Amino acid sequence: MSAYKYYDLIRKPIITEKTTTLSEQNKYAFYVDKFAEKLTLKKAIEEIFKVKVKKVNILNVKGKKKRFKGIIGTQINRKKAIVTLEKDHNIDFAGGIK
């Protein structure tokens, strides 16, 4: 699979307080394509970030119901992947920002 297809699998990284504490354990969270599978995600992360992946966990996140100006709507359903890296590898999302 080409690198362009790998970039289509990973939507965006999830950067919250909870995932920041997970990154200390070499675990990183991403929103991924709803048809993504564990093996293809493992190859995509290794190819894009040049790291060694130990394990990939995937979960489906159901969209919440929200009210906006009296109209009830739902957020989109998403798929989330939590990627565990090998011991000496890490991903730097900040990119050297000071």
UniProtKB/Swiss-Prot annotation:
A Pfam short name: Ribosomal_L23
Claim: NAD is one of the keywords in the record: no
Gene Ontology process terms (BP): translation
Transmembrane regions listed in the UniProt entry: none
Signal peptide: none
Keywords: Ribonucleoprotein, Ribosomal protein, RNA-binding, rRNA-binding
GO cellular component term of the entry, any: ribosome
InterPro entries assigned to the protein according to its UniProt record, in alphabetical order: Nucleotide-bd_a/b_plait_sf, Ribosomal_uL23-like, Ribosomal_uL23/eL15/eS24_sf
GO molecular function ontology, one term from the record: rRNA binding
SUPFAM superfamilies reported in the protein's UniProt record: Ribosomal proteins S24e, L23 and L15e
Subunit-level organization: Part of the 50S ribosomal subunit. Contacts protein L29, and trigger factor when it is bound to the ribosome.
Described function: One of the early assembly proteins it binds 23S rRNA. One of the proteins that surrounds the polypeptide exit tunnel on the outside of the ribosome. Forms the main docking site for trigger factor binding to the ribosome.
Family: Belongs to the universal ribosomal protein uL23 family.
Name this protein carries in UniProt: Large ribosomal subunit protein uL23
Species, as recorded: Rickettsia rickettsii (strain Sheila Smith)
Species classification: Bacteria, Pseudomonadati, Pseudomonadota, Alphaproteobacteria, Rickettsiales
Gene designation: rplW
